[in-house]
Regions:
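N-terminal catalytic cores of NTP/NDP-binding nucleotidyl/phosphoryl-transfer enzymes
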Residues: 50-112, 220-226
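Short amphipathic alpha-helical segments, especially helix-boundary/capping motifs
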Residues: 24-28, 61-65, 111-112, 179-180, ...
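Divalent-metal (Mg2+/Mn2+/Ca2+)-assisted nucleotide/phosphate chemistry catalytic cores
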Residues: 41, 121-131, 135-231
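Short, well-ordered alpha-helical scaffold segments within catalytic/effector domains
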Residues: 47, 51, 85, 199-202, ...
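Short charge-dense sequence patches
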Residues: 27-40, 75-90, 150-158, 178-188
C-alpha cells in the first residue's frame, strides 16, 4: 500500500511539473540547453552529436525535430509515459519542434522489445480507440498545432501503409538474423524454443523508417527501445 501511495504521489508531482514547468531563461547557452535535455537521461548516442546539432540549431535559428513515438497497444498511460511527457515539455519550452508519433501501423505488429512472448495482434478498431485515449491525455500537457512552436501529431500509417516491397527489401539488408538474435527478448525465446515471428524481426526497421520519414534530429525513448532507435 505504501509503495502505491508513493507512486501516486510521484505521478501527482510529475503532472504538476507538466502544468507549471520551471521557467527557462532566454539567453541559455548550448551547454545549459544540453544539460536540460539530458536531465535524468540514462544513455545518449552520442552526447557530442547532440552538442553539434544544438550548436547548428542555434546558429541557423532552426529548431531541432524531436521525435517521441508510442504504439497505442493499451488503453491508458503508465508512469514511464509521464516521465517522457515532462521531458518533452521542457524541450518544447526550449523552442524545439516536438513530433508525437502515434504508431497506429506498428501497433498492429507489436514491438517485441522486452517481451517474453509475441504480442497479441490488435484490431484496427482497438488501435483507434487507444489512440483517442492517448491523445486526450497528452494534449492536456503538450501544446499541439501548426505553429512551429507547438508539437505536431503524426501517424506512421501515413507512410508505412504505402511502403512497397521495392522500397522495403533494400532496408532488410541493413540487419542480420544474428544481430536480431543477440537481443535479450529474442535470445531468451530462441533458447526456450518459443516462436519468434518474422514480423517481429522487421519491427526495428519500421521504427527506423519512421525517423527517416519525419526527418528527426533526435529520438527519445526508453532503454528497451535502444536497439530499435539505433537502427
Amino acid at each position: 500500500m505504501e509503495k502505491e501511495e508513493k507512486k501516486e504521489e510521484w505521478i501527482k508531482q510529475l503532472k504538476e511539473n507538466l502544468i507549471n514547468p520551471p521557467k527557462i531563461k532566454a539567453d541559455i547557452t548550448i551547454e545549459e540547453e544540453k544539460k536540460i535535455i539530458l536531465e535524468k537521461t540514462a544513455e545518449v548516442y552520442t552526447e557530442h552529436d547532440l552538442w553539434k546539432k544544438l550548436k547548428k540549431s542555434k546558429q541557423t535559428k532552426k529548431p531541432l525535430i524531436i521525435k517521441y513515438g508510442i504504439d497505442p497497444t493499451s488503453s491508458g498511460f503508465h508512469l514511464g509515459h509521464f516521465v517522457f511527457l515532462r521531458q518533452l515539455k521542457k524541450i518544447q519550452d526550449l523552442g524545439h519542434q516536438i513530433i508525437f508519433l502515434i504508431g497506429d501501423f506498428t501497433a498492429r505488429i507489436g514491438d517485441p522489445s522486452d517481451k517474453k512472448a509475441a504480442r497479441q495482434p490488435l484490431t484496427k478498431a482497438q488501435v483507434e480507440q487507444n489512440m483517442k485515449n492517448y491523445f486526450s491525455i497528452v494534449s492536456r500537457y503538450i501544446k499541439f498545432g501548426e505553429d512551429g512552436k507547438k508539437a505536431k501529431l503524426a501517424y506512421n500509417s501515413r507512410w508505412l501503409s504505402k511502403l512497397n516491397l521495392e522500397k522495403f527489401f533494400p532496408l532488410t539488408s541493413t540487419l542480420t538474423v544474428s544481430q536480431m538474435l543477440e537481443r535479450d527478448c529474442f535470445s531468451r525465446r530462441f533458447k526456450d524454443n518459443k516462436p519468434i515471428g518474422v514480423n517481429e524481426f522487421l519491427y526495428p526497421l519500421l521504427q527506423g523508417y519512421d525517423s527517416v520519414a519525419l526527418k528527426a534530429d533526435v529520438e527519445i525513448g526508453g532503454r528497451d527501445q535502444t536497439f530499435n532507435m539505433l537502427v
